Curated annotation (Swiss-Prot):
InterPro entries: US22-like. Keywords: Early protein. This is Uncharacterized protein FPV250. The lineage of its organism: Viruses, Varidnaviria, Bamfordvirae, Nucleocytoviricota, Pokkesviricetes. It comes from Fowlpox virus (strain NVSL) (FPV).
Length: 140
């Protein structure tokens, strides 16, 4: 486990906030205590290890939160043996933010800006790909 977490602080904050309110039946404060970096064990190459306010240890990976131990002591003894026994998926009863709230959300605005930059910077490439596809379609 790597305590020198090599993920952007903004991404870690977002993951932590999501784990606190979107996965467990009741909102629960959590702290990130480490990250396991290993593409062999995780789809996204990072298992985020969290401790809840009641001392339970969870692992976040690929849109699921796994309870792996009831205490830090238990976690240090058994590691990830219980991974998969107790799985929490994002709650479906949460309604999306209204557009006016999304327009005020800093994180969403940054994502939108990055997407706009990608589109603007890649416009010529997109057009070339479309032209290529259209020419192939006509040739067939």
């Amino acid at each position: 486990m790597d305590r020198n977490i090599n993920l952007p602080e903004e991404e870690l904050k977002y993951i932590k906030e999501c784990c606190e309110v979107l996965y467990l039946p009741q909102p629960t404060r959590m702290d990130i205590i480490g990250v396991m970096n290993d593409s062999d064990i995780s789809w996204n190459e990072n298992l985020i290890i969290l401790m809840s306010e009641d001392g339970k240890i969870y692992v976040y990976d690929d849109e699921a939160l796994y309870k792996v131990a009831d205490t830090m002591e238990e976690f240090s003894e058994i590691g990830l043996i219980n991974l998969g026994n107790e799985v929490y998926h994002c709650r479906e009863d949460i309604k999306p933010l209204p557009e006016e709230d999304r327009d005020k959300d800093e994180y969403i605005m940054k994502i939108r800006e990055k997407a706009r930059q990608l589109i603007d910077n890649s416009q010529k490439d997109f057009e070339a790909i479309l032209d290529s596809l259209e020419n192939k379609h006509v040739s067939i």
